[in-house]
Amino acid sequence: MSTYLIGDVHGCYDELVALLQQVEFTPGQDTLWLTGDLVARGPGSLEVLRYVRSLGDSVRMVLGNHDLHLLAVFAGISRNKPKDRVTPLLEAPDADELINWLRRQPLLQVDEDKKLVMAHAGITPQWDLPTAQACARDVEAVLASDSYPLFLDAMYGDMPNNWSPELTGLARLRFISNAFTRMRYCFPNGQLDMYCKESPESAPAPLKPWFAIPGPVAQEYAIVFGHWASLEGKGTPENIYALDTGCCWGGTLTCLRWEDKAVFTQHSNRQADSDDDKAAIAS
């Protein structure tokens, strides 16, 4: 039995299938972990959701910012952008079932035996694990409730950007979703910066990647995340793994086998040749 962790799929269904064939993934015996952003940009978001849902207990995933945006589009809150290529999913006969399944997926995965946690963007250094788990449950409960459109309508925005246990209501939920799904850079005190899109080498002082600021979770657990394709899986501490390697932009889909830390890749079926693609990789 093996545990395979794969970075952001972004609708790259063919590459996902090829990568799972490469590692000889066996549902029912092996477990697949997915860092979120299953949908958008690649051509096969519908097929990805259908396949991942079919895996049942053999998959553990987290929601990413593009997954949350899809929920907002389906709810009529946000606009369907042609570049996201999700129209076939929105118009599918099983769209309701897929969306209802997706909005009941978690923001955080924890395996105590493996001392392993996974979140789409990472874990803010301002949180210990019990706080992260409680915060994840707050948003997950709203997403699974009938009032989820209210949260989806309020989730867009960059403030508040500093954690406080005294945060309440939609402001609290927005901070939590930003920390789990959009975070890249922080100030030295752990306060989020939602604006910088530079590479770590070019980021202005005093900003640092969230994983470069000591936090309590990383002291006890390995952390797996996606979201940040321009890292190309490099530059993180030894126990923190960046798995988004930009498959939908012409890069690769990356898989980490947890038991021996072997890394497998599947090249994208497309090339990043447009200015929009290059800008997206840089961000």
UniProtKB/Swiss-Prot annotation:
Family from the record: Belongs to the Ap4A hydrolase family.
Class of enzymatic activity (EC top level): hydrolase
Source organism (scientific name): Cronobacter sakazakii (strain ATCC BAA-894)
Keyword Hydrolase: yes
Name under which the protein is recorded: Bis(5'-nucleosyl)-tetraphosphatase, symmetrical
EC number(s) stated in the UniProt entry for this protein: 3.6.1.41
A Pfam family recorded for this sequence: Metallophos
Catalysis performed (reactions): P(1),P(4)-bis(5'-adenosyl) tetraphosphate + H2O = 2 ADP + 2 H(+)
SUPFAM superfamilies attached to this UniProt entry: Metallo-dependent phosphatases
Molecular function terms, GO-annotated: bis(5'-nucleosyl)-tetraphosphatase (symmetrical) activity
Protein task: Hydrolyzes diadenosine 5',5'''-P1,P4-tetraphosphate to yield ADP.
Gene3D superfamilies linked: 3.60.21.10
UniProt entry keywords in alphabetical sequence: Hydrolase
Domain of life of the organism encoding this protein: Bacteria
